[in-house]
C-alpha cells in the first residue's frame, strides 16, 4: 500500500497543537486529506475518539462525503495495523461523530435544549415554499396596518420610489433588510445602530455622514477601475505612432483621476473641475482601428466618471437636506422591518416552525448571555469536543462565528479551513471578511499558544501552465480593495503532481 506523503504545509496543519489554526487551502491543495488526517492523528497519537470532534461542512452532501472518507481512511490504517484495538473501536464511532452542516448541528442542539429556550418539543424546519408564504402574509399584514395609521417616518418609507400600486418592491425591500439583519448576532441591536447612524442633524460636512463616507469609498474604488481603462488606452497610444497625439490628453486625464481619488473630502472634490479636455483631430489616421478603440475606451471611461461624480455636484447644505429626507424614509423602513420581524416570528411560532435563521439565532441565544459570554449550556457543549473543525470557513457569517466562539475553549481549539478566492455565497450573506480578519491577524510563526496561519498552495490537480495562467489572473484582480487581500507569491498556486493526495 503506497505511503501518502504530506507536504510541509499539510504536515503543519495536521500536527500543530495548542492554538487556533486558520488554514488557507487553495483549490486542489488536499484540504479534505488534511481534515481527516488531523482527526486521525489525534485519535492515534493522543488516544482520542472520533466522536470527540465537531466537523462542520457547508452541505449535507459534503458531510456525507467527509464521513465516508474518514471511514475509508480508518479502514486503510487498520489494514496496516490490524491488531490496533483503539482503531477498531473507532469504526463504529464514526457514525456517532458530529459531522454535519452548521444548521444540522444547531437543530440537534435545540432538540436537546428545547426546554431551556421554551421551544415546542415538536418544532420542525419550514421548507422554503412554506417560509416564503409566511413571509408574504406577514409583510402584507404589516403594510396594511402601516397604511391605516402611518407615522411620518413610515409615510416617507411608503413613498419610496418603486413602492408602486401593489407595493411589491417595498415588500421585497422590507424582507431584504430583515434578511440582512439576520446575519448579525443581535439583529435588533444592529437595527438600532443603523438608525443612530442615519442621524445627520448636527452635521455640516456630508463626507462625515455614513452616506458620505460610503460614497467617497465607492468613488475611490470606482476611479481605480476607471484609471485602469485609461492606462490601457494610454498604452495603445504610446505603442502606435499613428495615435501618439492622444498621449498628452490621456496623461492629463489620468492625473485628473488621481487627484479626484486622493481628494478625500466633499469640499476637496468640489474644488476639482472634472475637465477632461478634447482629443486633437487626427486626419486620415494610419491605424483607424486602434484610433477607434482608444476613443471608445476614453469616451466610456469619462461617462462613467461623470456618473460617479453626480452625487458630489450639490452644495454641502443641499446634500445634507437630501440626506435628511432619505434618513427619514430609511427610519420608516427600519420600523416596518421591525414590525415584519415580530409578525413573521409570530406566524412561525403558531405553527411550531423554525427557519434556517431561527436555528442559528436560537442556538446563539442558548449558548451566550446578553453580554455575549458563554452560558452553562455552552460550557456543557464545549466539554463534548476536543476540537471544532470548520470547512469552507470563508462562507461563514457573524452568527455562526459567534456560535463557534461560544463552544470553543477561548478560541484555542478551533481548526478553520477555507479559501477566500472560493467565496461564492455572498448572495446568501456569507461574510468572507471574517476569514480575512483572521488571515491578517494570525501569524505564520506565532509565539506559543498564539493563533497560527498556514497556507496550502501546492496544487495536486492541475498542470503548471494552467496554474500560471490562474495566478496571472488573480494577481491582476485580487487587491486589498477588490478581494480583501493582495495576491502575492505566498498565495500563488504551485504545481505539485508528484504527491498522492
Regions found by a protein language model. Give the residues of each.
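Conserved glycine(s) of the Walker
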Residues: 30-31
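Conserved ATP-driven helicase/translocase motor core recognized via long
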Residues: 52, 171-354, 450-451
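Walker A/P-loop NTP-binding motif
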Residues: 34-48, 442
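Helicase-core coupling region on the C-terminal RecA-like lobe
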Residues: 164-179, 455-501
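Conserved helicase NTPase motor core
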Residues: 6-9, 14-15, 20-24, 34, ...
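Acidic, low-complexity intrinsically disordered tails
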Residues: 1-2
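Conserved P-loop NTPase-based nucleic-acid remodeling module centered on helicase motor cores
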Residues: 50-159, 210, 214, 433-437, ...
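Short, conserved catalytic or adaptor-binding loops enriched in Gly and charged residues
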Residues: 86-93, 440-449, 497-499
Amino acid at each position: 500500500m503506497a505511503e501518502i506523503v504530506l507536504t510541509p504545509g499539510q504536515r503543519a496543519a495536521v500536527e500543530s497543537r495548542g492554538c487556533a489554526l486558520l488554514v488557507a487551502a487553495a483549490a486542489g491543495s488536499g484540504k479534505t486529506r488534511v481534515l481527516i488526517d488531523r482527526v486521525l492523528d489525534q485519535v492515534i497519537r493522543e488516544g482520542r475518539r472520533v466522536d470527540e470532534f465537531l466537523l462542520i461542512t457547508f452541505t449535507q452532501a459534503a458531510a456525507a462525503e467527509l464521513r465516508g472518507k474518514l471511514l475509508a481512511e480508518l479502514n486503510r490504517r487498520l489494514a496496516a495495523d490490524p491488531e490496533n484495538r483503539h482503531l477498531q473501536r473507532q469504526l463504529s464511532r464514526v457514525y456517532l461523530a458530529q459531522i454535519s452542516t452548521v444548521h444540522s448541528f444547531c437543530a440537534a442542539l435545540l432538540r436537546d435544549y428545547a426546554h431551556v429556550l421554551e421551544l415546542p418539543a415538536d418544532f420542525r424546519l419550514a421548507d422554503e415554499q412554506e417560509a416564503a408564504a409566511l413571509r408574504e402574509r406577514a409583510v402584507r399584514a404589516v403594510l396594511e396596518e402601516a397604511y391605516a395609521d402611518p407615522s411620518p417616518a413610515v409615510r416617507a418609507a411608503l413613498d419610496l420610489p418603486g413602492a408602486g400600486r401593489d407595493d411589491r418592491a417595498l415588500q421585497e425591500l422590507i424582507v431584504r433588510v430583515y434578511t440582512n439583519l439576520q446575519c448579525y448576532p443581535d439583529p435588533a441591536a444592529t437595527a438600532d445602530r443603523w438608525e443612530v447612524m442615519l442621524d445627520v442633524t448636527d452635521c455640516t460636512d456630508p463626507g462625515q455622514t455614513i452616506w458620505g463616507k460610503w460614497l467617497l469609498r465607492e468613488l475611490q474604488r470606482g476611479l481605480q477601475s476607471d484609471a485602469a481603462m485609461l492606462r490601457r488606452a494610454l498604452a495603445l497610444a504610446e505603442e502606435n505612432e499613428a495615435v501618439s497625439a492622444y498621449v498628452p490628453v490621456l496623461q492629463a486625464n489620468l492625473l485628473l483621476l488621481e487627484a479626484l481619488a486622493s481628494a478625500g473630502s466633499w469640499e476637496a472634490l468640489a474644488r476639482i473641475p472634472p475637465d477632461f479636455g478634447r482629443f486633437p483631430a487626427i486626419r486620415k489616421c494610419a491605424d483607424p482601428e486602434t484610433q477607434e478603440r482608444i476613443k471608445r475606451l476614453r469616451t466610456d471611461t469619462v461617462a462613467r466618471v461623470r456618473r460617479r461624480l453626480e452625487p458630489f455636484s450639490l452644495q454641502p447644505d443641499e446634500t445634507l437636506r437630501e440626506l435628511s429626507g432619505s434618513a427619514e424614509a430609511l427610519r420608516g423602513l427600519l420600523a416596518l422591518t421591525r414590525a415584519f420581524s415580530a409578525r413573521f416570528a409570530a406566524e412561525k411560532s403558531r405553527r411550531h416552525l423554525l427557519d434556517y435563521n431561527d436555528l442559528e439565532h436560537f442556538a446563539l441565544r442558548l449558548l451566550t448571555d446578553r453580554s455575549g459570554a458563554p452560558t452553562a449550556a455552552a460550557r456543557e457543549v464545549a466539554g463534548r469536543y476536543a476540537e471544532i473543525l470548520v470547512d469552507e470557513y470563508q462562507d461563514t457569517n457573524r452568527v455562526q462565528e459567534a456560535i463557534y466562539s461560544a463552544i470553543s475553549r477561548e478560541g484555542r481549539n478551533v481548526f478553520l479551513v477555507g479559501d477566500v478566492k472560493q467565496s461564492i455565497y455572498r448572495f446568501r450573506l456569507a461574510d468572507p471578511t471574517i476569514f480575512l480578519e483572521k488571515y491578517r491577524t494570525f501569524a505564520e510563526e506565532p509565539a506559543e499558544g498564539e493563533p497560527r496561519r498556514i497556507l496550502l498552495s501546492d496544487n495536486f490537480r492541475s498542470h503548471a501552465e494552467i496554474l500560471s495562467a490562474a495566478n496571472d489572473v488573480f494577481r491582476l484582480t485580487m487587491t486589498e480593495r477588490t478581494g480583501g487581500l493582495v495576491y502575492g507569491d505566498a498565495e500563488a498556486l504551485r504545481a505539485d503532481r508528484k504527491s498522492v493526495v
